Amino acid sequence: MKERVFLDTNVLVYLFDADDPAKQRCVQDLLSNRELWARLILSTQVLQEFYVSVTRKLATPLDPEAAFQAVQDLAAFPVVQIDPSLILLAIQRSRKAKVSFWDALILEAALAAGATLLYSEDF
């Protein structure tokens, strides 16, 4: 069985960030591998953060309708639902490993989905 691959929010945001062409190209190269698509996993946190980031945090933000369509497209991939048990695990990991809660939650979602590879700029 091929490894499952979890994408952090920042990876997806760079796909739409024309102000950072080097990172944008890196993500385009990564996602040009169609074989990878069958192994991708996201989480509800990733979808939420993605929408906010591409509509509010980019120098040239996406219009809300384009961002909605992007989230709708991303939601076609397997999506880990963030539930109270993952939140509690993330709190524990964040305290023990001294990482941000949000990064710990990404990691817990990836682990819950059985991901063996996590793409992020935060780890």
Q: What are the residue ranges of the model-derived segments?
A:
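Active-site neighborhoods of divalent-metal-dependent phosphate/nucleic-acid chemistry enzymes
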Residues: 3, 77-121
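Acidic active-site catalytic centers that drive phospho-/nucleotidyl reactions
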Residues: 8-10, 49, 103, 122
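Alpha-helix N-cap/helix-start and coil->helix boundary motif
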Residues: 12, 47-48, 87, 112
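Short secondary-structure boundary segments
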Residues: 44, 120-123
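Active-site-proximal, substrate-binding regions of enzyme catalytic domains
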Residues: 45, 51-78
